[in-house]
């Protein structure tokens, strides 16, 4: 049972939670592909998306100083290059415009989402210590700084820095240790059942699942202490209003 009165600290996921209100970033980017009328199928896009993620995980492309707009420009460029290499797209001026337009649309999407959440995050910060635990590319500090989010978190646990990635429960153990509180008095808030909720539960934390359009199908039995479909519902859960 989730009793907010027992909560003394909060661990937040970042990507897919704070910056997209539960929607997997693959689908945010796919929506931008469609808006820019990129002539590829959803399956071709998924191939390119996976390729880019794997490439970024194994190559030093994202620099520590890159904000989210720069990150997106680099990521979309890799996707477009893959689609050209595979013969799904024909290289030309239009393909250059795709990278620019899609990255701008996605960055604007994130900025608008976050701007609506900042008052809520400020209210939470006034009541609770908060730690961020994120699988990211080594530039999450620059991303948070650009979005004016850095001051909300007492500590940031980033996979590329600590050498542990979700769904390994150890990365959440680091978050619990950073808060210095009993795990049962900490709630983890994230959008991924596999990468956030399960490892948080293994640490003994309470969980709030921001359930949106994920990458694949969720296990039908998947659950958390609280399930929400909109970030702003946290205001009600934490009795902030």
Predicted regions: what they are:
Residues 1-10, 43, 90-93, 118, ...:
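Asp-based, Mg2+/Mn2+-dependent phosphohydrolase catalytic module
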Residues 3-118:
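N-terminal helical cap/lid subdomain that shapes the substrate entry/recognition surface
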Residues 126-127:
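Structured helix-beta-strand junction loops
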